[in-house]
């Protein structure tokens, strides 16, 4: 692998390249924080895909794209005389040192769980830091990830089930309430009744999903990763179903559910 000097040279190289692009390229020159934001989200999702697929070469490329965006935002901040890349890095370094007193000072921790609790506690005491436990969870996060992060933040200050097994009563309770509202929605007569029942059912569905996320978290599972794996599995099997149907000269719309299930089970048996 590369030496520290080579790493610093590479970092200096990208800084020089971006300086030149910002000055001489019409597209790069007109970019703003706002115009870059959707592209940044896309790059992060592409990075996530590379991680999930275990493609190391692709991971290296996608990390570079994300790094470019970090440096780009810092360059824009520098042009506005608000901050530059040195401020960004120093702020990060100071934060890491402050939040790891068990590494850089004399504090002691018993394990990873204590580190997380210490991290959350220190965040609330920082100057200009997040003074509320949940203020560090962005509103723009996807709902599943947001639920997980909110629950994890609350856990960091002790707001959690005493025993993980207790969560199942809550899951069953929320599932029952959701089913009851679905029944009420089916029995509704007027449009107003249907609208009100739909709203209540949606609310209870949210509670049920939130409780399910909690159950996953308490057992050390990441629901976002789990659902991503299931989506990938569904894609593989459905693609197999489509391909086999085409090979037979048929169309999915013309097949019975039993016929599709049979091909689906074939794909499942093949480990797809």
Where are these regions (language model features)?
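Flexible "arm" and connector segments at domain edges
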Residues: 1-62, 68-205, 210-272
């Amino acid at each position: 692998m590369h030496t520290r000097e080579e790493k610093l040279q590479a970092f200096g190289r990208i800084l020089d390249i971006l300086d030149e692009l910002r000055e001489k390229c019409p597209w790069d020159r007109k970019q703003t924080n706002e115009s870059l934001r959707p592209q940044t989200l896309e790059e992060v999702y592409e990075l996530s895909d590379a991680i999930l697929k275990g493609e190391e070469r692709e991971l290296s490329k996608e990390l570079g794209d994300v790094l470019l965006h970090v440096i780009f935002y810092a360059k824009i901040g520098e042009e506005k005389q608000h901050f530059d890349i040195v401020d960004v890095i120093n702020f990060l370094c100071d934060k890491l040192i402050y939040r790891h007193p068990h590494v850089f000072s004399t504090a002691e921790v018993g394990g990873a769980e204590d580190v997380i609790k210490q991290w959350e506690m220190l965040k609330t005491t920082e100057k200009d830091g997040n003074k509320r436990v949940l203020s560090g969870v962005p509103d723009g996060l996807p709902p599943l990830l947001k639920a997980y992060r909110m629950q994890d933040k609350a856990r960091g200050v002790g707001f959690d089930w005493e025993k993980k097994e207790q969560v199942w009563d809550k899951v069953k309770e929320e599932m029952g309430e959701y089913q009851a509202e679905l029944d009420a929605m089916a029995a509704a007569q007027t449009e107003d009744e249907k609208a009100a029942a739909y709203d209540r059912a949606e609310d209870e569905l949210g509670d049920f999903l939130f409780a399910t996320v909690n159950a996953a978290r308490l057992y050390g599972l990441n629901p976002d990763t789990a659902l991503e794996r299931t989506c990938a599995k569904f894609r593989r099997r459905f693609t197999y179903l489509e391909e086999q149907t085409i090979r037979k000269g048929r169309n999915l719309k013309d097949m019975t559910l039993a016929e599709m299930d049979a091909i689906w089970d074939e794909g499942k048996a093949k480990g797809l």
